[in-house]
Amino acid sequence: VKLFLKAGLPTESLQLLLGEGENIGNIILNDIRIKGVVFTGSCKTADKIKNNLSKRKGEIIPLFAETGGLNFMIVDSSALTEQVIDDAIESGFYSAGQRCSALRILAIQDEVYEKTLNMLIGATNEITVGLPYLLSTDIGPVIDHDAKNRINNHIKSFSNKVKAQSPLNIDSHSFYVQPTIIEIDN
């Protein structure tokens, strides 16, 4: 909020309201002063917002929703491999891969496939998973037990295609997941 105000946005144009979506969201969405909604989060919540907005009386207002997706990067022979690796590691694994904009699929041109894959495997093996407050940590835990199980089950379903997993030198009973490279065809 401070940065928006510092950039010149009028004070009356932006308010930060914290609270449970079910309690606050419904009230806000039904207020006739609301002329648009921008949302980042789950598809389930975006659907709830869309349904609430569709029941509003009066004009139809726009909804911009950024939800989870299968974001991908295409790598061809003109790409700088070192930059590709940096971008892929940051986008795919930082924030424990939990951003809705996190890289999920890396499509690599055949001519640069082996070099890129080998460098990506090397970089993945260097990732330190650990406590977020330690300077030596690259990646912290996922949000909860369900997220950990969902991710690990996905990895297990592709266990014969795993090309690399960073070491996990922390309590496996907590919410940590190994950053993993899975090779898929087509």
Segments the model singles out, each with a brief description of its role:
Residues G25-L29:
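Short hydrophobic/charged patches on amphipathic alpha-helices used for structural packing
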Residues V1-I24:
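PLP-dependent aminotransferase-like
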